[in-house]
Amino acid sequence: MSKSFKLHSVFKPAGDQPEAIRKLEEGLENGLAHQTLLGVTGSGKTFTVANVIADLNRPTMILAPNKTLAAQLYGEMKEFFPDNAVEYFVSYYDYYQPEAYVPSSDTFIEKDASVNEHIEQMRLSATKALLERRDVVVVASVSAIYGLGDPDLYLKMMLHLTRGMIIDQRSILRRLSELQYSRNDQVFQRGTFRVRGEVIDIFPAESDEWALRVELFDEEVERLSIFDPLTGQLQHEVPRFTVYPKTHYVTPRERILQAMEEIKVELAERRQVLLANNKLLEEQRLSQRTQFDLEMMNELGYCSGIENYSRYLSGRGPGEAPPTLFDYLPADGLLIVDESHVTIPQIGGMYKGDRSRKETLVEYGFRLPSALDNRPMRFEEFEALAPQTIYVSATPGKYELEKSGGDIIEQVVRPTGLLDPLIEVRPVATQVDDLLSEIRIRAAINERVLVTTLTKRMAEDLTDYLSEHGAKVRYLHSDIDTVERVEIIRDLRLGEFDVLVGINLLREGLDMPEVSLVAILDADKEGFLRSERSLIQTIGRAARNLNGKAILYGDRITASMEKAIGETERRRAKQQAYNEERRIIPQGLNKKIGDILQLGQPSMRGKGKGRGSHKMADTTQYQSLSPKALDQKIRELEAKMYTYAQNLEFEQAAELRDQVHQLRQQFIAIS
């Protein structure tokens, strides 16, 4: 039985929040398909959205533009809804090299990928929650528009067990094998089962904390129990249980056999086309590769690159949209697009890049034409499938504004009373020396500075110059991966250095209350990096500090500068009036620095017997580890944990289990 959403927060809606919540809920109840929440930095947009979710009690998907923001949102939602299902759905690849062919050098690049099994488990948990309950919030990246197993086939493959049902042991084991679970009587881990007499222990693929024990008497299920897979301690009995497939891509045997026949027909047709065009090498290559795949599918039920045959496996027609996470979201679900000015263009761009790579593979005989249907959703398909949508951004794009029409809800007033930064325009001629003196003032009072330049070269030269003149400075650029980026931002907040130089710092989306000055060099150069939207976003980076200030260096005031300054001053005036009316004294934000890397940890553990009662594991010694080293440490601790469990040293195993759990959350936050 699904519970209702229960919002946990010490705060009550304030400022513009109550009005924004009322208007959003009113719009949703009146059937509005699109609404935009225009909320300034630090106005509590996430809290507003959480209130809407709790009040309307509808399954919700939140789309974020990248894993970093998704992790931050997941942590915040976990804290708002500790008693409900808050799930995380991002790409499970630590590394991914798609197969490709370069005709100019006759080079074929094989597909190569490394799957993160912890994130895979969280993806499985997300789809299970969407299928089983209504109090669900799934925080997803644009990975949600990529093909996923067909929900109808996924549901058909599930194994339902109930107390008292008549089923023999061999049938259960056969069904578990069909779900791609493997038998392992020695090491009991996620996605495996073990058999001891008439007892079958199953470790569900979507869980990392508990397992199922099935006790049979002859051919009857006598008891179903949930137990701790490490200590073996029974937690409670259940009257029924559903075992979900180990992967989203599991397919019934009949469907595979049917798909094989359809693939053979397409292969014969394609061979004729290639031979008619005198493409003998391509014809031979295609025949050889496809026959090998068919043989593997016949023997094992799957093959390497089976996703290229997804059209046949899911029973779709040519050109039809692939099944995605959106197919798992109920019809009355709610979609929140966070930082929509970045996320919406991303959705539109995914399909085209994927298409051009696959067309080359098809043309040169590496894949059948049906492989083109293994793709992300097209933008039109996303629009058709998306449920009622709320776009959330400080600077909504043209698309959101057009779709929302007049339904744009402003959230400009901050409950904290914080004002938008003061803006000054200064001449370009002395910008570097002027900036250096401003940096020294901020460093002396333990505040931080962000500087944006137009080019990589300029950012590098400026970093060198500032460093030579005694400033503690770092440079953030596109070659630095997401994980290092989070570490750099964390070090900035901790005061390891005072100045961060970059080209496009506005898309980080992370809270940095310590930043009191944003300096925008060459602000009068019109273009993508100095557009009205970019300027407002960049100025907003200083909006979480009491002494927030933005300096725009330019010899003239461009149209974009004028609009950005005008909009910021309008918001500042509105906040000032609100503060005076209610006698509010602005308060700085005290967001803990660890929050960036935490995923709602206080509420991660359950409150049931034996699981929530132990103390929080101490993992402070691993905080400084790089992502690679952290992943290695998790593997080492897991190996030790299983060794302790096998030696019946359950206390030590449970201690390590808690450490592993904490480190996984840390790893996900920075992956």
Curated annotation (Swiss-Prot):
Location within or outside the cell: Cytoplasm
SMART domains reported in the protein's UniProt record: DEXDc, HELICc
Signal peptide: none
A Pfam family the protein falls into: UvrB
Binding site for ATP: 39-46
UniProt cross-references to InterPro entries, sorted A to Z: Helicase/UvrB_N, Helicase_ATP-bd, Helicase_C-like, P-loop_NTPase, UVR_dom, UVR_dom_sf, UvrB, UvrB_inter
One of the record's GO cellular component terms: cytoplasm
Residue span of motif Beta-hairpin: 92-115
Main location: cytoplasm
UniProt domain Helicase ATP-binding: residue ranges: 26-183
Single Gene Ontology BP annotation: SOS response
SUPFAM superfamilies recorded: C-terminal UvrC-binding domain of UvrB, P-loop containing nucleoside triphosphate hydrolases
Highest taxon of the lineage: Bacteria
Molecular function per GO: ATP binding; ATP hydrolysis activity; DNA binding; excinuclease ABC activity; helicase activity
UniProt keyword terms in alphabetical order: ATP-binding, Cytoplasm, DNA damage, DNA excision, DNA repair, Excision nuclease, Helicase, Hydrolase, Nucleotide-binding, SOS response
Keyword DNA repair: yes
Ranges for domain UVR: 631-666
CDD domains xref list: DEXHc_UvrB, SF2_C_UvrB
Self-association state and partner proteins as the record states: Forms a heterotetramer with UvrA during the search for lesions. Interacts with UvrC in an incision complex.
Role of this protein: The UvrABC repair system catalyzes the recognition and processing of DNA lesions. A damage recognition complex composed of 2 UvrA and 2 UvrB subunits scans DNA for abnormalities. Upon binding of the UvrA(2)B(2) complex to a putative damaged site, the DNA wraps around one UvrB monomer. DNA wrap is dependent on ATP binding by UvrB and probably causes local melting of the DNA helix, facilitating insertion of UvrB beta-hairpin between the DNA strands. Then UvrB probes one DNA strand for the presence of a lesion.
Free-text comment about domains: The beta-hairpin motif is involved in DNA binding.
NCBIfam families hit by this protein: PRK05298.1 (NF003673), uvrb (TIGR00631)
Family per similarity comment: Belongs to the UvrB family.
UniProt name for this protein: UvrABC system protein B
Taxonomic placement: Bacteria, Pseudomonadati, Pseudomonadota, Gammaproteobacteria, Enterobacterales
